[in-house]
Each structure stands twice: as C-alpha cells, then as structure tokens.
Design a protein with these regions (language model features):
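Gly/Thr-rich phosphate-binding beta-strand-loop-beta motif of the actin/hexokinase/Hsp70
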Residues: 11-45, 138-172, 223-227
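Helical "lid/coupling" subdomains associated with nucleotide-phosphate turnover
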Residues: 37, 58-88, 100-145, 160-163, ...
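N-terminal glycine/serine-rich phosphate-binding loop of ATP-dependent small-molecule kinases
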Residues: 1-23, 31-97, 111-117
Length: 318
C-alpha cells in the first residue's frame, strides 16, 4: 500500500505554498508496509528517509481473501506510521496499494476497515497504472530507451519505451512471493521446484510475437532488481560504483543460486537474508524477461513506482 499527501490548505491544481514542502508516501506490497518521506521544491524532490514494517500479510490470504487478522495487521502498520507523521507534522499524505489489495476478492471490505481504523483512504492502482508509475519513477533518474521491468511480490510490470516515451505496457499476476508460494515446497527450490517455477513463469509472462521487440537495454526497479545487483557485485566482482549487470553475469548468478550449493544459500543469507525464499523465484522472472527481449544489460534504477506516483501529483500542484 502506498501514500502521498498534500497540504490541507492547497487544492489539487492550485500552486502550492512557496516554502519547502514535505511529502510522505507509503507502500505495502504482499510482505511489507513502506513509509517514504520526501521533501519537494519546485520540480525537484529528494528522499529524507525510508522505513518499512515486515507485515507478513501473504500468510493472511485465504482462498483469495485477506483475512480479518491480515487487515488488522495492515491497520496496525499504518497506525504506526501515522504516529510518526503526526510527530513530524507532515500534512501531505496519500496512501496507495498495488497487487496486495488489487489481487484479493474482498478489496472493498479491506479498504472500508482500513479507513475506519486509520482515517486513510487507500487508492488501489491498476496493474497498468503500476507499470506506468514504475516507469515514470525510473525516468526521473534515467533517460534511456529499452524495456522497463518491476518485479513485485505478487505482480510483474513491463513497459517498453523509446526516447523516454512509453510505447506499450503490461502487468502480469505473478511475483517473487506469489511464485514461491505456488511452486516451492521448502525454503529454497530443489530440482522439481525449479522446473515448476520456470514453467509457471513462461506460461504467465507470455508476450505475443508482435509485442516482443529486441531491446539491448533493460531497466529494473524494485527489491528483486536491487538484490540481483547486490549479489552480482559480490559474486561477479562488480564494482560498487557500477549499477548494471550483463546477461552473462546474470546467467552465471542464476546458475549459482539454483545449484543447491550451501555457498549459494550462505550468500543470500549474508547479503539479502529477508529474501532467502523469494530471491530465486524473482531472479528466474528477471532472467526470463531478460532473454525474452534479448537484452544484453540490466540497469538498476534507485527510483520506482513510489516516485512515479509522486511525480504526476507534484506536477499537478505546480
């Protein structure tokens, strides 16, 4: 779930006060509730701090419904962040949710309970909006042509763009955590689980021939892409100043992580312990899309859907 906010004395479409303004945005995916505090001035912004709560909400989805306990868990996280925002006197707040509330059957019930408990109206953005917001966020840092990829816990967004302009986009109901829950029996996938993972990915992320155009460059955002870079920097001896991965490095890393060797699990535990169960499924999605577009290089952006959600709102206020 995510959020951004506006001053109480400023209406959408009007020019905001000239003083520096603080904005906060919160996002919850299947596992986490995120808080990000921004400071904006004119057409620029920078992140003051980020915070997250490990909510474990995926464990509360039963038969496609988020249980009462899961909704209560979400409310508790939001109330924790509301206390922080009240202490800091932040007056511009918006909350939005992605696949976490989009892909359940009782979305309206969850939204109603969350509003009653927290006072927040949560905007559930569509898969297409999530794809375009993620792309817009990445474009705040990068001005490139190629394909954009955001692997979340429950969905994967792909945007093809040219010269900073999106050409087309798609959202797929498959993510690192949902894939893990569907295909993996233990913490790390064995040979049978790897076969199920690859089959599920190829069947779900299946673009038409007309939609597939070879792109040498792939831009990645989100936790899976950042974790891939972090592990590649260690395993492939990439400089910490480098924010890209080649197809050869990605394939070598995937082969190592899927090898079943203790050194592979040790590497994940040392660098990305909280992703011990979801990293391999996410990496296999990344590898599939990489080869689908014939990409030669992955560039990781520090901005994503939250900054993309922030940007159009901020533009409307100026």
């Amino acid at each position: 779930m995510c959020a951004a906010s506006k001053s109480e004395n400023t209406q959408l479409g009007q020019r905001p006060p000239t003083r520096r303004q603080q904005r906060r945005e919160k996002r919850r995916n299947v596992r986490r509730i995120h808080l990000t505090l921004y400071k904006t001035e004119g057409q620029s912004f920078h992140i003051l701090f980020r915070e997250k709560i490990m909510a474990g909400l995926a464990g509360y989805v039963e038969d496609g419904r988020l249980s009462a306990e899961g909704i209560e868990c979400a409310c508790a996280g939001l109330l924790t962040f509301r206390g922080i925002l009240q202490t800091l006197a932040i007056d511009r707040i918006s909350v939005f949710a992605t696949a976490s509330l989009r892909n359940i059957s009782n979305t309206e019930q969850a939204l109603s309970v969350i509003h009653a408990a927290t006072g927040y109206f949560v905007e559930v953005i569509s898969g297409e909006e999530e794809a375009l917001f993620g792309y817009a966020g990445a474009m705040q840092e990068l001005r490139l042509s190629g394909a954009f990829l955001d692997i979340g816990g429950a969905s994967t967004e792909i945007v093809k763009f040219d010269g900073g302009t999106p050409v087309n986009f798609a959202s797929f109901p498959i993510g690192s955590l949902s894939l893990y829950r569907r295909c993996v029996k233990k913490i790390l996938p064995g040979e049978g689980s790897l076969k199920r993972l690859r089959q599920e990915i190829s069947q779900t992320i299946d673009l038409s021939e007309d939609a597939i155009v070879l792109h040498p460059l792939l831009i990645g955002v989100g936790g899976t892409a950042r974790a891939a870079l972090k592990l590649a920097q260690h395993y492939c001896k990439i400089s910490d100043d480098c924010h890209s991965i080649t197809v050869e490095q990605l394939d070598a890393l995937c082969t190592f992580l899927c090898s079943g060797k203790k050194a592979a699990s040790d590497l994940i535990l040392r660098l990305e312990a909280e992703r011990i169960h979801t990293l391999v499924p996410g990496m296999l999605i990344l590898q599939h899309v990489f080869h689908l577009f014939g990409a030669q290089q992955l560039v990781i952006s520090k901005y994503g859907v939250r900054e993309g959600y922030l940007w159009p709102c901020k533009t409307a206020w100026t």
